[in-house]
Amino acid sequence: MSSNKLLKSFTEGIFTDLKLTLVDDYQQSITINVHKIILYIKCTFFEKLLLFNDGNITEKTINVPNVYVCRDIIESFYLVDNKSEVDKSQTNQDPMYQFQLYICRDFLGLLQDKNALFNLDIPINMLDDFFNFAELYSNNNNMIRLIFRNIPKNYDFELIPKNLLLAMKKYVSESRMYILDDEYKLIQYDLCPENLSSKIITHRIFNRKYNSEKYIYALGENDFAIVKNNTIEIYDYQNEELINQIQIGQLLINDIKDIEYCETNLLIVTGYTLLLINSDNGKILKHKKFDEHIKYVTFTINCIYVNFKKRIKVLNYETMDLIKDIECDNRHDYVGGKIIYDLSENDLSGCIIVEDVLSDKIISFNHPTGIIKRIYGLDVDFRFEKYVVVDWSDIIKIFDVKHGTLLSEYNIGKISEKYQLNNVTVLYAKFLHDTRYIIIKMNFGNYFVLDTLKQELMTISSKSLNEYRTHYKISSYCQYLPEINSALLNQID
């Protein structure tokens, strides 16, 4: 028998004053005897429930995501000494239980472990049940990311509920561009497929001005960061609301070059040093110093790509140990563990190399046809095995990843003539969605979307902008297995 009298009062119903019935969508129902004061103190959901209802109620029925998991959570409210008492909600390591625990804690408004879903592995024999349950929470950002982490490469997408597939496609194909204009207003351009097909690129101008900040740093699809005094402030794009403040040392603030989300923590570049910082309290979790000045850093599925002037170092996320040291001319792109780069200033000038850095395997090594000297832009979409190159000819060229075969090319100089654009220079080009649309940057800070099917240009912005104030990033969900992304798009289409 438990020595914890508080827990004993729950398990044996001693002096309880509320009969609580839990029901869920699985036709499950259980009734437990609880103490209103415990629920009131421990849980905001129950606090509001009890305050809203008559304080004299003795019976109450509520709908919950899972009755048994919620019961375990309520029982945990009675634990005084976690060392001597077993918290069932924390000791049950079954993946489906942990998944439902996350949902139930979210439902009850309890604090969550930010890494709870990131570290969850769903066995393949449980995927069907997992998808059916996840369909109810398809608008949850972390839920969709968990799905992408666990789908096997050759999984039959017909087994996934249609609504869930549609939600997954939204996350894969969404793309937005953020520009800080000359008046220090932040502008968001929505480059979703629907807008592009209708040739109407909607935009939103944010309310506040950002003239006192050195830079704005985009953090994934949902948040952005600014640096003020000795604080990193994180805002959400949707409401432009402050969601987190991280206090860090003044010496770090003065030398910050880049900030990036790394799972739920922050990667910060300060000169020659890479820091992994807890996004809750600013504590430095890991740090690594280099002999060269770091330009920027990117996290993508267990790998950290650290970019220098003439090389890229690929690190293991957990240990920060070196996986691969790659010399290149800084024209490159990477998705997950795959990287593509050029050697335009090397003895192998004009050669494009594609590698799988995790398996240390060369995927392709070839000289693409029609490249004229120096490459200005290089972007890849492994979902469709294509990459796009911009050289000094102002002709955008699309190649096959494996063989370097020229698939198509678009003379931007000629296309732009009918829009009365003169003396244009293409600085870079990036794929959007399914490779039909390409976002391009020209001289004088002009941004356009090229419809390769119709060979037409759509204007995003014609303002003259400092390139360091502009950020474009395709959805990070595209970094997951390319085979999964292409199968997903094909299944929906």
Curated annotation (Swiss-Prot):
This is Putative BTB/POZ domain-containing protein L35. Belongs to the mimivirus BTB/WD family. Residues 16-87 form the BTB domain. InterPro entries: Quino_amine_DH_bsu. It comes from Acanthamoeba polyphaga mimivirus.
